[in-house]
């Protein structure tokens, strides 16, 4: 699942903590398919070690991690806040973690909803205050008392360090922000400090148990993709493929989609986050399938682009080869101790050279005039077709922190995607401002844009850097052209088009084409 251009791999901010080095720092590790499972729960001792590391990174005072509230809309599936989850592993709504430190003294409190037999009839059993210590090794408190306890602690300590869903929204403030507003109002002299970066630095290096869950998430995700391809044929609805994949994930123990599933055919393949998934795939088109599952709270992220009729056209094949070559070029840079930036640089060079050869850009370094008339600037022509980052970390959320954003280097414990893409929108020339210089650019690339219009290709895999090597956890889903075409040459699974026709009549007033 692509991220915006601003998240493209880049030089990190300076950090004063030492970077771990290995004797084999510059040795290229073999990228392999997944190995045997670890098969164990994350121990309470690992969560305790995470809290120890966080306390060591923060000054004395009060730290607060806020869990997510109970969903308010029709009992939708609850997802815990990743910061709170990382530090506790506790998956009930309405909980909070408070850590108080002063010198060598330290106390940890987990605030949870109290037992309520009448309420539990509706939403399931609660651990309750009494169950916290024997289960999690923390001191339990009732969530109803959180505000009062914080007020008493903040009367002594001048700062509150917070991690949670804070400061993210441009408009509506989150419930976490609203809670902190009340804390500030009650304690006007207290400084509220964003502690998310401190937790992110810990989350960026995955433990063995976390890597095991990410491996399983990748394996199950790939099997869902394979199941979807068994149905692929001209005339199928995008949502049928989505349903086939998501069924396999749940059947195999996945938690459900790790982000909004993207299945985009034809022109929809050129929309990065298209997730309506309601179009009918047509003969001669490509279809981008960017969908994945969580497993035990850890997110995979996998994208494949395949021909609806089972065979790539010459134009589709040409664009696909460039994107695959870019991914392989980046993949060759994945080595312990290697610079993370080299992955993006290698992929970008391949994409730019390939687009030049197809006539879609004038040269690898060519630019066009972008911005506004008042603030004109030059942008790479490459960015007309490749406007997102090469990849991102994966973990408790699909766009998770990874240590390379801090250290600039790949190390054991990294977990990330590599996902180059090219998107030739039919109206691409309309995106280019109509300046005298740009008119000449449009004239030179216009024929190529028309030739490759509506071709969108993205190829994405997940990479886990372990003590014994680098695992491409999504490798079971083919990416080579010959392997994809061979897979699609197999007999198609039967489907009932009447069901889809019914949907079409209700949504559009006409049957499926």
Where in the sequence are the language-model features?
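N-terminal secretory signal peptides that target proteins for export/translocation
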Residues: 1-17
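Generic short amphipathic/hydrophobic targeting helices enriched at N-termini
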Residues: 15, 26-27, 38, 146
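Bacterial N-terminal signal peptides
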Residues: 21-35
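Active-site neighborhoods and metal-handling regions in enzymes and metal-associated proteins
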Residues: 6-9, 38-513
């Amino acid at each position: 699942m692509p991220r915006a251009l601003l998240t493209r791999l880049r030089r990190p901010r300076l950090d004063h903590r030492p970077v771990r080095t290995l004797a084999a720092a510059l040795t290229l590790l073999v990228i392999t398919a997944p190995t045997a499972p670890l098969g164990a729960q994350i121990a309470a001792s690992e969560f305790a070690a995470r809290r120890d590391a966080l306390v060591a990174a923060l000054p004395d005072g009060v730290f607060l991690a806020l869990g997510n509230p109970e969903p308010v809309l029709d009992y939708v599936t609850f997802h815990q806040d990743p910061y709170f989850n990382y530090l506790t592993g506790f998956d009930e709504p309405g909980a909070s973690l408070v850590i108080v430190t002063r010198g060598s003294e330290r106390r940890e409190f987990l605030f949870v909803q109290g037992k309520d037999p009448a309420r539990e009839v509706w939403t399931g059993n609660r651990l309750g205050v009494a169950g916290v210590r024997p289960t999690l090794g923390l001191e339990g408190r009732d969530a109803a008392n959180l505000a009062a306890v914080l007020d008493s602690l903040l009367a002594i300590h001048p700062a509150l360090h917070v991690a949670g869903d804070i400061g993210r929204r441009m408009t509506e403030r989150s419930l976490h922000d609203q809670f902190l507003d009340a804390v500030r109002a009650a304690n006007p002299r207290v400084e509220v400090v964003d502690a998310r970066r401190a937790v992110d630095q810990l989350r960026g290096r995955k433990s063995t148990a976390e890597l095991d869950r990410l491996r399983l998430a990748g394996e199950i995700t790939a099997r869902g993709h394979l199941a979807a391809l068994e149905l692929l044929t001209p005339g199928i609805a995008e949502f049928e493929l989505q349903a086939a994949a998501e069924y396999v994930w749940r059947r195999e123990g996945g938690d459900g989609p790790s982000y909004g599933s993207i299945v985009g055919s034809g022109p929809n393949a050129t929309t990065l986050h298209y997730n309506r998934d309601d179009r009918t795939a047509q003969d001669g088109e490509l279809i981008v399938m960017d969908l994945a599952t969580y497993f035990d709270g850890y997110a995979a992220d996998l994208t494949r682009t395949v021909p609806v009729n089972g065979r790539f056209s010459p134009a589709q094949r040409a664009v696909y080869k460039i994107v695959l070559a870019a991914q392989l070029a980046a993949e060759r840079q994945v080595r312990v101790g290697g610079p993370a930036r080299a992955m993006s640089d290698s992929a970008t060079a391949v994409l730019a050279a390939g687009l030049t050869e197809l006539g879609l850009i004038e040269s690898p370094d060519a630019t066009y005039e972008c911005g506004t008339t008042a603030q004109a600037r030059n942008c790479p022509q490459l960015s007309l077709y490749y406007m997102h980052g090469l990849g991102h970390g994966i973990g408790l959320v699909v766009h998770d922190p990874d240590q390379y954003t801090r250290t600039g280097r790949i190390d054991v414990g990294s977990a990330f995607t590599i996902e180059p893409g090219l998107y030739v929108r039919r109206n691409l020339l309309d995106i280019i401002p109509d300046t005298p210089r740009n008119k000449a650019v449009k004239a030179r690339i216009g024929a190529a844009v028309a030739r490759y219009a509506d071709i969108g290709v993205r190829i994405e895999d997940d990479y886990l850097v372990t003590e014994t090597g680098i695992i491409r956890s999504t490798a079971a889903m083919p990416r080579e052209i010959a392997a994809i075409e061979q897979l699609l040459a197999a007999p198609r699974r039967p489907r009932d088009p009447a069901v889809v026709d019914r949907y079409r009549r209700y949504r559009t007033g006409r049957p499926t084409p």
